[in-house]
Every structure is written in C-alpha cells, then in structure tokens.
Amino acid sequence: MFLFIIIAVVLLVDQATKAAVQMLMCQGESIPVVPPAFYLTYIMNPGAAFGLLPHKKMLFVTVTVIIIAGVLVGYFKIRPRKPVLDYGLGLVAGGALGNLADRLRYGLVVDFLDFRIWPVFNLADTAIVTGAFLLAWALLNDSDKSSKKERK
C-alpha cells in the first residue's frame, strides 16, 4: 500500500510542477532563481534523459510499461520487503509514470530544472534517479550481508 502512496505523490507533484511551468512560462524561457547556478528553463524534450534518442516515443512508452511492470513484480515478489525498497520502487514507478503521461499527452516531456552544467530535467527524472540509487544501495547492502553470512 505504501508503494502506491509514493507513486501517487510523485506523479501528482511532477504533473503539478509541469503544469505550473506550462501556465506561467513560455517555451524556451529561462528564469534565474540562483544565478548563475540554477534557473527554471521551460523546454519540451523529444528524447530521453539529456535529449538522447529524440522522437522515439513508442520505444519510451514500451520501456516505461516494462519498467512499471517490473516494479509491480518486484513489489509483490520481494520478501521480506524493506521500506527502502518501497521508496526506491515507488520513486522509479512514479517518475516513469510522470514522464509517460507527458509522452502520451504531448509526444514530448516537459523539462524545467536547469543547473546550467547539466542538461535540463524535471522532478520525474529526479525521482527515477533517486529511486534507482535507493534500489542499488538496498541490493548492494543486502548482498554484503549475504556474503558475510556465507563467510561465517
């Protein structure tokens, strides 16, 4: 149940921030927040993270559906389930759904977080990366414990 709350919160916050950017900014507009380090820059991204593989909508939709299916399988198969796994799975799925909603609606993804030293991205991207790190940490931490038990 907790997983689905995380997914819903990530999806709602992601879509709300993107809607606000679209209502309040013109495409291509950039607003300094903490110059020169951080700006809000409204772009429509035709590709994946960092603009990779532009205009491959069906590829991204297919991969996203596979990722979400994997999250659900992981959620129901992993026992005992630790909270860090729910957070990781929820962040990845919520972020994936946020970008999927954009792709299905516009054929593009709304991006707006601009640190100038990195390509422009959005909250869904942040959730996906954070969730992936949490999952990797949980799996590595668990494998360390397993290997210590085997050595004893």
UniProtKB/Swiss-Prot annotation:
Active site: 111, 125
Membrane topology annotation: Multi-pass membrane protein
Pathway this chain belongs to: Protein modification; lipoprotein biosynthesis (signal peptide cleavage)
Chief localisation class: membrane
A single MF term (Gene Ontology): aspartic-type endopeptidase activity
Entry keyword annotation includes Kinase: no
Keywords: Aspartyl protease, Cell membrane, Hydrolase, Membrane, Protease, Transmembrane, Transmembrane helix
Pfam families noted in UniProt: Peptidase_A8 (PF01252)
GO cellular component: plasma membrane
EC annotation from Swiss-Prot or TrEMBL: 3.4.23.36
Top-level EC class as recorded in UniProt: hydrolase
Catalysis: reaction(s): Release of signal peptides from bacterial membrane prolipoproteins. Hydrolyzes -Xaa-Yaa-Zaa-|-(S,diacylglyceryl)Cys-, in which Xaa is hydrophobic (preferably Leu), and Yaa (Ala or Ser) and Zaa (Gly or Ala) have small, neutral side chains
Record localization: Cell membrane
One of the GO biological process terms: proteolysis
Transmembrane intervals: 33-53, 58-78, 83-102, 120-140
Keyword Membrane appears in the UniProt entry: yes
Family: Belongs to the peptidase A8 family.
Known function: This protein specifically catalyzes the removal of signal peptides from prolipoproteins.
Protein name per its UniProtKB record: Lipoprotein signal peptidase
